[in-house]
Amino acid sequence: TYSDPLLFINNSKVTMAQNDINVSDNGVAAYMSGNSEFKNWNRITLGQKSVGIYGNNSSLVSEGTLIEGTLQKSRGIIGVNSNIRNSASIKMAGEESLGIYSGNTSGTLKNIDNSGNIEISGKKTVGIYLEGNSGQTVNNRGNITVHETTEPDRNNSTIGIYAKDGATVNIINEGQVNVGKKSVGIYSISDGNVTATNTALLNVSDEGIGIYKKGGTVNLGGTVNVADHISSANDSEPVGVYGIDGVSIVNNAN
């Protein structure tokens, strides 16, 4: 349960004067509904279990400098049955934190467009998390940096983009994804496809996984760099694409 937001934006546009916003524990900086825009803020600093921008049945636009969280279970942007367009940088370091969360049960397709840079670290922290029983399309044009996972359990990995099963989620990556040791760049168990365009760059460290895909299709373009395997741990080889359950991989990468 979140406390009342600092700003309530309904079918409106709010333009700040490069202000900084500090969000208390369990707080929300801006709650948005309808066609709304929140622009020109400088830095949103998140407390524990707090949210920078919360969109509900909205087509929201987020244009600022940085959303940053270092405490547990913070959320940069939450979209519930919403379209999201974000150009702000997001940096999350607290355990079980999410840069952008989108849950869609609306029955209509929702679009998530991110051009901001995302940097994540911490146990079970995810850059962009997608779930729900209705379809979504994600287009990432920013750079995503997934730092090393320090937890020994793979279930606690740090992940750049995660698509849960339950609906068709198509992920299109045009940007650079840097995957640290034992981490995952894109992890999709939805019915949709993962596409890396010809502008995409995927860098995978030792013991890392670039793209993990269950079923569907991976259209791999751009450039993929996989580090040499140095670790002596069992089953720890770095992988550009790891596919299971009949996934089709179309490889046009360099």
Write out the residue ranges for each language-model feature.
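Surface-exposed loop/turn motifs in large extracellular/passenger domains
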Residues: T1-S50, Y54-S97, Y101-S183, Y187-N254
